Structure formats: structure tokens, C-alpha cells
Swiss-Prot record:
This is Putative S-adenosyl-L-methionine-dependent methyltransferase MSMEG_0095/MSMEI_0092. Its EC number is 2.1.1.-. Coiled coil: none annotated. Gene3D superfamilies: Vaccinia Virus protein VP39. The keyword Iron does not apply. S-adenosyl-L-methionine binds at D134, D163, L164. GO terms for biological process: methylation. Belongs to the UPF0677 family.
Length: 311
């Protein structure tokens, strides 16, 4: 059970769950600077720089990795692994959306979109509409910041400012969503912030709204062993002050580590979808982005990338 969450909590881009979107965007910004980048997000740095978290802007420093290496080489390996994970995850779901577009799907829904910039940076076919669902202040920050820099979406982008714990299907319909058309859904970086029951309800609603031929891609919620989680927390504390990261939220305090959470692929297979999964570590290995860690990671602590098609 999360210790910092309540049933009706809200946030903006610099607080609570909202700040995790800045963390992820910082990882995309770092990846974009690499010569061998798996993805290119030219807008991530802009979104991080203006967020005002006072924390993740630090990661934009080109010397950040070297500073960690000097303080704690093993921690540097962990940070490199985390950055590679974000790059591989983004790469996987970018490919998912390109395949959906190639299949003729023109209705896109991004659940808890955060600072996702796909509406702006992917080469969407004409006639594509991207619906982004998230907290009102998060959506407002993203669109306003990019607009200030003269950046406009490639696809038709429609904001759906609503909490996924409330009546988001009505808000989605009000924004123009057509349930009779095939949809490509995305739940990336979301499930760990939902209780197990809310996860089931989310997929029930998505299924109700999905015409035959619809697709969904999901990042599952990994479950880290308690001792490993505590060890990581203590290691982070050792150098956080020296890197201006001491005010960073403890992400583990925001997630719901529910042991009875349904297996996503099994749930989808049982409810009218045909699903398959790729474990994150296997995908990282395939793309030559698997970093050797000081402790052999438990596969259960890492996500599986699930894709499915509505029958």
C-alpha cells in the first residue's frame, strides 16, 4: 500500500505522481543526447527545464553521470540501467504505435499521458487523433510549455483532463472519442500507481470502449523484494545531498505494491483480447542496453511489455 497516496489525491507537474513524469522526460532527454540513441525526443529537455521540480533538472547536466561515477560506481551502474530501461521502454511503445498506424488505426488514447510527447514527435498519418488523459494541471503545463516554444502537435491532439479513478469514459466521449472505431491504447508508467482493483476496473472500461481490431500496449507493474527496495533507498540517500537530489520524492512511496495484482496478459486473454508479452530485461538485452548490476536483479522486479489485439 502506498504511504503518500489517498483515494482523491491530486497533483501538478512538480508534485507527487506528476513529478515522476518529469523524471521520465529527463531520461528521454538524456537518451536523445546519445550518439546511439534508441529514440529522439527533442521536446523532453524543454519540458523538464520548465517543470520547477528543483530535482530532475539536475539530470540534464552533461556531467551528471560522471559525478555519480565518482561518488559511487555501483550506483552509477544502477542509474545507467534505469536510463536504459526508459529508453528501451519508449522505443518499444513507439514501435507499437507505428505498427498500429500502419494497420490503419487513427484513434489513439494515451492513459495518464504525463509529459508523453508522441502527439508531437511521431510521424502520424493524416487523420490521426491523439487523446491524452491526465490530471488537468499536468496537461495544461505540457501544452502551454510547448506552445510557448512554437511547437505544435503532428496529429490532432485532444486533452481529456480527468483523473482515471473517476468517470474518464464520459470525458473521453465528450472530447470526441468514437467507440465504434478501432483504438490503439497505451498504459505506460501507469499501473504501479493504481491499486489492484483499480487496474482491473481500468481494463474493464478499456475493453468496453474497444471495437474489434483495437489494440492495447501496457507496461506491467514489477514487484521489488522489500530488502532490495530498502537497499536501493539507502544507497540513494548516501549521495543525494551531493547531487542536489535530496528533495526527490521516494517513488516507492507513491506506488501500490499489491501482491494480488492480476497478470495483465492473462486478464486480457480472458476478456476478449489476444495478448503477448516481452520481459523488459529481454528487450534490453536484445537492444544491447542491459547493464551489469552489482546485484543480480530479480526478474519480478521489472516490468513486462504487453501488447494485445481485441478479437
Amino acid at each position: 500500500m502506498s504511504s503518500l497516496r489517498t483515494d482523491d489525491d491530486t497533483w501538478d507537474i512538480a508534485t507527487s505522481v506528476g513529478s515522476t513524469a518529469v523524471m521520465v522526460a529527463a531520461a528521454r532527454a538524456g537518451e536523445t543526447e546519445r550518439d546511439d540513441a534508441l529514440i529522439r525526443d527533442p521536446y523532453a529537455k524543454i519540458l523538464v527545464a520548465g517543470a520547477g521540480t528543483g530535482v530532475w533538472e539536475t539530470v540534464l547536466d552533461s556531467e551528471f553521470a560522471a559525478k555519480i561515477e565518482n561518488l559511487d560506481p555501483e550506483a552509477a551502474a544502477i542509474f545507467a540501467h534505469m536510463g536504459n530501461y526508459q529508453a528501451v521502454r519508449t522505443h518499444f511503445f513507439d514501435a507499437y504505435y507505428r505498427e498500429a498506424a500502419d494497420a490503419g488505426i487513427r484513434q489513439i488514447v494515451i492513459l495518464a499521458s504525463g509529459l508523453d510527447s508522441r502527439a508531437y514527435r511521431l510521424d502520424w498519418p493524416a487523420g490521426t487523433t491523439v487523446y491524452e488523459i491526465d490530471q488537468p494541471k499536468v496537461l495544461e503545463y505540457k501544452s502551454a510549455t510547448l506552445r510557448e516554444h512554437g511547437i505544435e502537435p503532428v496529429a490532432q491532439r485532444r486533452e481529456v483532463p480527468v483523473d482515471l479513478r473517476f468517470d474518464w469514459p464520459t470525458a473521453l466521449h465528450d472530447a470526441g472519442f468514437d467507440a465504434s472505431l478501432p483504438t490503439a491504447w497505451l498504459a505506460e508508467g501507469l499501473l504501479m500507481y493504481l491499486p489492484a482493483e483499480a487496474q482491473d476496473r481500468l481494463f474493464e472500461l478499456v475493453t468496453e470502449l474497444s471495437a474489434p481490431g483495437s489494440r492495447i500496449a501496457v507496461e506491467t507493474a514489477g514487484v521489488a523484494a522489500t530488502d532490495r527496495r530498502e537497499a536501493m533507498r539507502e544507497r540513494f540517500k548516501k549521495f543525494a545531498d551531493q547531487l542536489n537530489l535530496s528533495s526527490a520524492l521516494d517513488i516507492q512511496e507513491l506506488v501500490y505494491d499489491d501482491p494480488d495484482r492480476a497478470d495483465v496478459a492473462e486478464w486480457l486473454d480472458a476478456h476478449g483480447w489476444r495478448a503477448r508479452g516481452v520481459h523488459a530485461l529481454d528487450e534490453m538485452r536484445r537492444l544491447d542496453r542491459l547493464v551489469e548490476l552489482p546485484d543480480d536483479p530479480d526478474r519480478a522486479a521489472f516490468s513486462t511489455f504487453v501488447t494485445a489485439q481485441r478479437l
